Amino acid sequence: MTAEKPALRVKSGTEDFAKYIKYGYYYVDKTQYLRPIFDADDRLLILRPRRFGKTLMMSTLRHFLEMDYDNPGDTSKQQELFKGLKVSEDQEFCEANMGRHPVVSVSLKDAGQTTFQSSRRMLAMTVWKLSNQYEWLKNSPKLNDGEKEFLNDLLDRKLLCRGDGESDGVLQSSLSMLCQLLHHHCGLKPVLLIDEYDFPLQYAAMNHFYDQMIEIIRPLFSVLLKTNPDISKGILTGCLRATKEGIFTGLNNYTVNSVLTQNRIDLHRADDVEHGVAGEAVARVGGHGRTEERRVGKECRSRWSPYH
């Protein structure tokens, strides 16, 4: 009798791609979508319902694309993470993009609060935490004194949270400046990833402070203008297309990819559930025989049927 492979652990509550691979959690391989997402357009907005894998896909993109800033050209971390996954079969794409890009990746989920003051504060905290990932740029010989001074402002939590005109100016310019700093240091235009871009606006609309919030968010998103010389690609995810009051004023010719568009990128598909989960998952997670496979397959289909 052939010995059965040990069951993989099913993990919920984490959206970090690297943890799935590092700790051996069960992972449905969707890395074949990295190239369609990356090649779609210089400015791409992906719209999907909640729990559709958007955040995990953005995490996967970051781990695939982001270069080793200490050792540019070293892709050993990516080689280990993506070994045996579908994207590794696309050698041309991997050689051109795996570990080759500076990346700025941020989620605006925490900025969805019930009052303007709390939303703005959480947005400021999000920017502060993001900026701390790039504190090492203070030692870059390629940045001028003005750029380093602005970076110090981004690292000043009290300044960001203060809420006056100076504070708003730093907050609104934060993404543009982080991209500029990385561009000047690395000599490569970074990829900008914004997850849950619409979350603070949804809460603002529901709680009647949309006009206040849009005055902060609109300048923040000016980084996405195609005239911006400091980013190569901008990829956003969310549930809704926020068009009220011109949030994307000046941003022309960007691509929207939703479940209604003909060129949609299927982050979840019926055949993924049918074959990827109901077949592969049962064998790897611990199913035994066709009866168990049918039972788990039926449960998977029932859970995902609203999205087929």
Predicted regions and their residues:
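Positively charged, low-complexity/disordered segments
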Residues: T291-H308
